[in-house]
């Protein structure tokens, strides 16, 4: 089964074969990127616009690199100097972008649902690069690809997601994806940072780090999202690390071959110790960044082919 949807707005609602199709295509691009070969004809003559209403380094750069490696004309729109900063509404922005006839629109916005709204108003294929606390689908895909490359599978693995789950769109997308593909997901954090309805998602919830990490195959750490927090959710960063920071002693509770992940940006000494983050064997944080480019190439490829009604193919 190919990925034949007009947009990528969320992981929730995708069928497992669609997810596997994107992961398989991304694996092909990961191998292509490591070989030094290019696929610059695929999006030649197509325009990709990165529209980021929130600051981003990794995601925007990753999409830009993915587009350029496929031959697209890539435009990065700076919201701080655009008409949006002068009071233009999101719908007016959509109308303006539609008049430009771009082919692919990558959107990051502080409000949940903004990419969905744009997808209803523009002719371009829209990719959600993170919307509020809702979802971040390409991050979940790159995380899944990284896990699959190290573990050979996703089904049957125990994945511990630790930290500020309440405000994390990354956590939500990962929960939907991992549960869909047969992983057992654990959420670890203080009660103030775990969603109240988490039990409805088919996950296990732990408020004790040692218990939650016991026997885990994958440990995924999340940063404290101070910019989205109300005051009083955690007493202090020092206290937070004392109970929920990942150090070598806590990591020993997981399986000996457990891998360490983090979507970035990292706050060293708050949610993760430097020695753990930089572990040359178990940390796959740098590989996550690498797989991000491959995943975004796969998503751009799949959406562009869907718009052109071209048959799916693997890069060579």
Swiss-Prot record:
Domain of life where this protein originates: Bacteria
Catalysed reactions listed for this entry: carbamoyl phosphate + L-aspartate = N-carbamoyl-L-aspartate + phosphate + H(+)
EC number(s) reported in the record: 2.1.3.2
Pathway annotation from the record: Pyrimidine metabolism; UMP biosynthesis via de novo pathway; (S)-dihydroorotate from bicarbonate: step 2/3
SUPFAM superfamilies reported for this sequence: Aspartate/ornithine carbamoyltransferase
GO molecular function, one term: aspartate carbamoyltransferase activity
Keyword entries, A-Z: Pyrimidine biosynthesis, Transferase
InterPro entries: Asp/Orn_carbamoyltranf_P-bd, Asp/Orn_carbamoylTrfase, Asp/Orn_carbamoylTrfase_sf, Asp_carbamoyltransf, Asp_carbamoyltransf_Asp/Orn-bd
PROSITE patterns recorded: CARBAMOYLTRANSFERASE
Enzyme type, top EC level: transferase
Signal peptide from the UniProt entry: none
Role: Catalyzes the condensation of carbamoyl phosphate and aspartate to form carbamoyl aspartate and inorganic phosphate, the committed step in the de novo pyrimidine nucleotide biosynthesis pathway.
NCBIfam families (UniProt xref): asp_carb_tr, PRK00856.1
Family membership noted in the UniProt record: Belongs to the aspartate/ornithine carbamoyltransferase superfamily. ATCase family.
Protein name, per record: Aspartate carbamoyltransferase catalytic subunit
Organism this protein belongs to: Granulibacter bethesdensis (strain ATCC BAA-1260 / CGDNIH1)
């Amino acid at each position: 089964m190919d990925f034949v949807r007009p947009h990528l707005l969320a992981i929730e609602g995708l069928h497992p074969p669609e997810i596997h199709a994107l992961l398989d295509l991304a694996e092909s691009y990961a191998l292509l990127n490591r070989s030094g070969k290019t696929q610059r004809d695929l999006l030649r003559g197509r325009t990709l616009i990165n529209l980021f209403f929130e600051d981003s380094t990794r995601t925007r750069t990753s999409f830009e690199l993915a587009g350029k490696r496929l031959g697209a004309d890539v435009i990065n729109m700076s919201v701080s100097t655009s008409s949006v900063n002068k009071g233009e509404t999101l719908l007016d922005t959509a109308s303006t972008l539609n008049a430009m006839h771009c082919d692919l629109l990558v959107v990051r916005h502080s409000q949940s649902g903004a990419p969905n709204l744009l997808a209803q108003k523009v002719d371009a294929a829209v990719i959600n690069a993170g919307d509020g606390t809702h979802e971040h689908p390409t991050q979940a895909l790159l995380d899944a690809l990284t896990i699959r490359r190290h573990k050979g599978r996703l089904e049957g693995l125990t994945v511990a997601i630790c930290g500020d789950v309440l405000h994390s769109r990354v956590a939500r997308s990962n929960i939907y994806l991992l549960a869909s593909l047969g992983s057992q997901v654990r959420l670890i954090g203080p009660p103030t940072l775990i969603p109240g309805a988490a039990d409805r998602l088919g996950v296990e919830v732990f408020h004790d780090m040692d218990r939650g990490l016991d026997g885990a195959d994958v440990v995924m750490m999340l940063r404290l999202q101070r910019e989205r927090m109300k005051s009083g959710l955690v007493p202090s960063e020092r206290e937070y690390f004392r109970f929920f920071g990942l150090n070598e002693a806590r990591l020993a509770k997981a399986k000996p071959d457990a891998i360490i992940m983090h979507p970035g940006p990292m706050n060293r000494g708050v949610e993760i110790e430097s020695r753990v983050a930089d572990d040359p064997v178990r940390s796959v944080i740098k590989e996550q960044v690498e797989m991000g480019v491959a995943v975004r190439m796969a998503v751009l490829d799949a959406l562009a082919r869907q718009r052109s009604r071209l048959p799916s193919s693997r890069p060579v």
